[in-house]
């Protein structure tokens, strides 16, 4: 199976590593096509590992993992192109936290009657959004 992963940080790489170990093809996506973390990760993981932009990763994946910081989740999906998510499963691993000078706080946009997962589902109505 082919998986696209939005993000190149620790969570994205751990998920990608395991999927590669299980014999799947994985493409890490970032804002830019030449992200150093993604390049190193792909070299380490061999022929089933690749990298590209958010758009390339989301187009590639039959299932997509969203592993960007929560404050960038909608922005990353917008950059990827919502059309690439249609009729697919999005596993959303984002958290709506803001990290600032060693302090963690909840993003005020998601501290009321809505949560980040709900906002992503509204943004992608033809996608099955799975929250951890």
Predicted regions and their residues:
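A structural micro-motif
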Residues: 1, 24, 49, 88, ...
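NAD(P)+-binding Rossmann beta1-loop-alpha1 motif at the extreme N-terminus of oxidoreductases
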Residues: 1-44
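Short, well-ordered alpha-helices that flank and scaffold nucleotide-derived cofactor binding pockets
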Residues: 17, 21, 78, 122
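Conserved beta-strand termini and adjacent loop/short-helix elements that scaffold enzyme active sites
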Residues: 29-31, 52-54, 132
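Short, hinge-like loop/turn segments at secondary-structure boundaries
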Residues: 43-47, 108-110
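Rossmann-like NAD(P)-binding element
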Residues: 46-91, 95-103
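Rossmann-fold NAD(P)-binding glycine/threonine-rich loop
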Residues: 89, 93-132
């Amino acid at each position: 199976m082919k998986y696209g992963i939005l993000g190149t940080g620790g969570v994205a790489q751990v998920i990608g590593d395991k999927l590669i170990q299980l014999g799947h093809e994985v493409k890490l996506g970032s804002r830019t096509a030449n992200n150093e973390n993604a390049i190193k990760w792909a070299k380490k993981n061999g022929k089933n590992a690749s990298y590209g932009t958010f758009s390339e990763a989301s187009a590639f994946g039959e299932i997509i993992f969203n592993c960007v910081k929560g404050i960038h989740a909608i922005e990353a999906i917008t950059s990827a192109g919502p059309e690439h998510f249609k009729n697919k499963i999005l596993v959303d691993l984002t958290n709506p936290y803001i990290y600032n000078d060693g302090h963690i706080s909840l993003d005020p946009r998601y501290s009321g009657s809505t949560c980040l997962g709900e906002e992503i589902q509204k943004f992608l109505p033809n996608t099955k959004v799975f929250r951890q």
